[in-house]
From Swiss-Prot:
Lineage: Eukaryota, Metazoa, Chordata, Craniata, Vertebrata
Name of the protein: PIK3R3 upstream open reading frame protein
Region Disordered, annotated ranges: 1-63
Organism this protein belongs to: Mus musculus (Mouse)
Compositional bias annotation for Basic residues: 27-46
Biased composition, class Polar residues, residue ranges: 50-63
Amino acid sequence: MGPSQLVRAPRPPGLTSPYRRPGMGGPRRRCPSMFKCSRRTYRQKPRGPTATNPASEATNISDTDTTTSVLILSPRVLRFLCQPGGFLVL
């Protein structure tokens, strides 16, 4: 009896793949579970005399939606990312 003749135990009907884990199923979220991600959208309004000054119009970005994404990393993840040879892109 070779290795190809091994009898596998029948899987429960809910499980389709032998490699599926309870936490890995379903559609993938944008942030993995080890990252906590919070997103905020700010609405910037022109205010003060600089909003009407055409000279400062190049530096003043007015009426734009600014989305700020904040990643809160656990210390274990930070240690993993800051190892020698690893690089962190922000």
